[in-house]
A protein has these predicted regions:
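Rossmann-like adenosine-cofactor binding region
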Residues: 89-95, 104
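C-terminal functional extensions of proteins
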Residues: 105-160
Length: 160
């Protein structure tokens, strides 16, 4: 619970209305380099966008790798896309250590848009900025997915 409160406070501070950066989703910056592209966490539409990427997942679906594969896949990766959930669940540090030879992007609505992440081998961070908070709260209370949140804010990407 304390981690969740801390993470929410970090995002409230960094993901502000006035922040500037590239107005695109971080996944739009990624090219398919086959298995040299490693994705940590499953994203909607990922198979279509990066059909040859190696996907590491906590509960792997068919075609995905288990978490233990990170030690083998990440050091050899050309680019690594990490779900922002890895920050809140505490798994981000070892993933970044293993990815030091790759271009690393942290992606997801909960990604804190902080340049401080660049000090930890992150090259880009792509998150979400809430613009219409009342509508967003209503969407979340109804169990809306990220696609339902999209009209109430904007994605933004910071680059190193």
């Amino acid at each position: 619970f304390e981690n969740a409160i801390g993470y929410a406070a970090i995002n409230a501070h960094h993901n502000r209305f006035d922040i500037t950066g590239s107005e695109k989703n971080g996944l739009d910056m990624v090219e398919d380099h086959g298995e040299r592209t490693v994705v940590v966490g499953q994203f909607p539409g990922l198979a279509k966008r990066l059909p040859n990427a190696a996907i590491i997942e906590r509960d792997p679906l068919p075609g995905c790798y288990p978490e233990e594969a990170a030690e083998t896949l990440l050091p050899n990766a050309k680019q690594v896309i990490i779900t922002a959930s890895a920050i809140s669940n505490g798994s981000i540090a070892p993933l970044l250590d293993l990815s030091k030879n790759a271009f690393v992007i942290i992606v997801g609505p909960s990604a804190p848009l902080s340049a401080k992440l660049f000090d930890f081998n992150v090259n880009a961070v792509s998150g979400y900025i809430a613009m219409n908070t009342d509508a967003l709260i209503h969407t979340v209370m109804e169990g809306g997915a990220v696609s339902a949140m999209r009209p109430h804010g904007r994605f933004l990407t910071l680059m190193r």
